């Protein structure tokens, strides 16, 4: 594999979170590898990624993408399958949605580093699509769409030679839903960014993306009951809903 042509595949580049931190490390390891991603919001990534060759799918030109990219979920499998990876000997995908479903050349090696199987299709389906989150029309169209996504998700497993998981929990999910074993490789950690402090505050701190699967609502409910202070740092689509629950 010394002279192998390498491609990196990542679901999408819309902000800087855990998956993108891992992709940043992959980009350092393979400095010449282009990045294939469904869509990219320019300026949303660190310079190491922004300066790379980034190849996007047809979704990049869809209307209202920046504010409503989740609307295009039914097209994600098709978009990743249309990436032409025939010139690459080694595919390294960073996947929490459809990146693992990229189609490699028959003799190419495909390793997928999985942050989680598709949460809203499997273990977190009801966190995303509970009845109180869906309107009349959505309650009729979402279940069959997610059913199709599950079918594709399982079918595309054969395109991956080896799975790696970012934790033992994710490795168990991979086996539960995919019946594939995954080796655990923990994500890189910047141990110099934070230093222990002798000062102690009078509140708890929660730092997270404000998305359904993080279950910030449970933490808010707990602190509403116990009377202790908690500060929440983060952004995401659940911001208004959670702020209302926190009486902030």
What are these model-derived regions, one by one?
Residues 12-13, 207-211, 236:
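Short donor-sugar binding/catalytic loops of nucleotide-sugar-dependent glycosyltransferases
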Residues 29-100:
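Active-site donor-binding segments of glycosyltransferases and PAPS-dependent sulfotransferases
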Residues 90-93, 104-135, 183:
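Active-site proximal beta-strand in glycosyltransferases
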Residues 92, 158-167, 231:
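A short beta-strand/loop micro-motif in the catalytic core of glycosyltransferases
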Residues 130-163, 171:
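Membrane-proximal helix-turn-helix segments that form the acceptor-binding/catalytic region
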Residues 172, 176, 183, 188-202:
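Acidic anion/phosphate-binding donor-loop and adjacent secondary structure
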Residues 240-248:
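Nucleotide-activated donor-binding/catalytic signature segment of Leloir-type glycosyltransferases, i.e.
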């Amino acid at each position: 594999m010394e002279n192998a042509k390498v491609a990196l595949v990542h679901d999408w580049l819309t902000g800087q979170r855990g998956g993108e931190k891992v992709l940043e490390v992959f980009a350092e390891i393979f400095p010449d590898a282009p990045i294939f991603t469904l869509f990219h919001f320019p300026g949303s990534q660190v310079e190491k990624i922004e300066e790379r060759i980034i190849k996007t799918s047809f979704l990049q030109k869809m209307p209202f993408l920046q504010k409503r990219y989740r609307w295009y979920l039914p097209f994600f499998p098709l978009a990743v399958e249309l990436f032409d990876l025939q010139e690459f000997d080694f595919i390294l995908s960073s996947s929490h949605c459809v990146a693992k479903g990229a189609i490699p050349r028959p003799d190419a090696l495909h390793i997928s580093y999985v942050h989680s199987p598709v949460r809203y299709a499997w273990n977190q389906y009801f966190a995303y699509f509970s009845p109180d989150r869906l309107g009349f029309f959505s309650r009729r169209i979402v279940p069959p769409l997610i059913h199709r996504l599950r079918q594709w998700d399982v079918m595309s497993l054969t395109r991956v030679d080896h799975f790696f998981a970012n934790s033992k929990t994710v490795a168990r999910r991979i086996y539960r839903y995919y019946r594939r074993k995954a080796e655990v490789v923990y994500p890189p950690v910047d141990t110099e960014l934070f230093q222990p402090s002798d000062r102690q505050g009078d509140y708890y701190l929660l730092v997270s993306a404000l998305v359904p699967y993080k279950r910030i609502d449970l933490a808010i409910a707990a602190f509403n009951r116990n009377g202790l202070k908690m500060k929440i740092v983060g952004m995401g689509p659940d911001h208004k809903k959670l702020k209302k629950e926190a009486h902030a």
